Amino acid sequence: MALNLRKNHPLLKTINDALIDLPTPSNISTWWNFGSLLGICLVTQIVTGLLLAMHYTADTSLAFNSVAHMCRNVQFGWLIRNLHANGASFFFICIYLHIGRGIYYGSYLNKETWNIGVILLLTLMATAFVGYVLPWGQMSFWGATVITNLFSAIPYIGQTLVEWAWGGFSVDNPTLTRFFALHFLLPFVIAGLTLVHLTFLHETGSNNPLGIPADCDKIPFHPYYSTKDILGFALMLILLISLALFSPNMLGDPENFTPANPLATPPHIKPEWYFLFAYAILRSIPNKLGGVLALAASVLVLFLFPLLHKSKQRSMTFRPLSQILFWTLVANLLVLTWVGSQPVEHPFIIIGQLASISYFTIILVLFPLAAVLENKMLKL
């Protein structure tokens, strides 16, 4: 009998077990597409980023002009830059939907996969933040100043830590060069963590919309889900290319068309849209350390989901109370995102504070309470 190379070759069999013969639940919906879409985002960002890095100069006197030169004089430089800038937005859209899916269907009960996923989110946020500083526009500079300054709220070592991160007494050339180094490095860290994430996922297999074991009814990944993934790729890439070609600056900040000036502060300092929810939570507490702790908690709270799961059912598919809370949480995050983009004045201050309180209340109090109540109602 001929040797089946796909199943016996040391390297090919790993790929085969992950992408071809992987046993997959037969009923996973389009919400399960976002993992592979994140993979495509990562590859796109690394490729476009590498091409941009070939023309970028990490120096305060040259950075802004090097980006302008790229868009004007490099073949398709404008397109590569627009794809990279908007690709970051799609990366976050996909990861937020992916996390939302995980919460709704109880995927967080695969604890190792979930924890690596949260670490991936934190790494992605760090990568996006340091990358945003590189074009050295006004909002790049002041965003870097404001966010790095938050570390000075850490008692005793805070100020030393910030000056160590800056490489001086303010955001300047050393800061820019180290941010470029980090922005180059971190995507490869993300790629490595992704492999760990998949390794843990393939230990248990995928969850499914019913939240029940599906071992009795598995189908091979290829051709079924490989085809389904390609459809997802096409749809996302159409949206990304449309955004990059028709309105590339829609999600950016107009302040970044002005070179960084340490002597002029923009009227409203705000991060990119994908950080606005966390920024709103940070601003809702009128104390520096308290705000920083709330900011950290807004993302780190994801680590607690496996511990807060009190329901006898895994997924929310048949749990209407939890569903109502889930969609309230989604609406709440949209409100936080909107408030984060508004100036610090009445009524936005109180709206932000109420939305921040309800964010933590829903996750830490109401989700477990609803689960216990549903167990009682169903006599489980």
Swiss-Prot record:
Xref: Pfam families: Cytochrom_B_C (PF00032), Cytochrome_B (PF00033)
List of residues binding a ubiquinone: 202
GO biological process: mitochondrial electron transport, ubiquinol to cytochrome c
Localization of this protein: Mitochondrion inner membrane
TM region positions: 34-54, 78-99, 114-134, 179-199, 227-247, 289-309, 321-341, 348-368
PROSITE patterns attached to this UniProt entry: CYTB_CTER, CYTB_NTER
Membrane topology: Multi-pass membrane protein
Cofactor note: Binds 2 heme b groups non-covalently.
Binding of heme b b562, residues: 84, 183
Required co-factors: heme b
Family annotation (Gene3D superfamilies): Cytochrome Bc1 Complex, Chain C
Entry function: Component of the ubiquinol-cytochrome c reductase complex (complex III or cytochrome b-c1 complex) that is part of the mitochondrial respiratory chain. The b-c1 complex mediates electron transfer from ubiquinol to cytochrome c. Contributes to the generation of a proton gradient across the mitochondrial membrane that is then used for ATP synthesis.
Quaternary structure (record): The cytochrome bc1 complex contains 11 subunits: 3 respiratory subunits (MT-CYB, CYC1 and UQCRFS1), 2 core proteins (UQCRC1 and UQCRC2) and 6 low-molecular weight proteins (UQCRH/QCR6, UQCRB/QCR7, UQCRQ/QCR8, UQCR10/QCR9, UQCR11/QCR10 and a cleavage product of UQCRFS1). This cytochrome bc1 complex then forms a dimer.
Protein name per UniProt: Cytochrome b
Lineage of the species this protein comes from: Eukaryota, Metazoa, Chordata, Craniata, Vertebrata
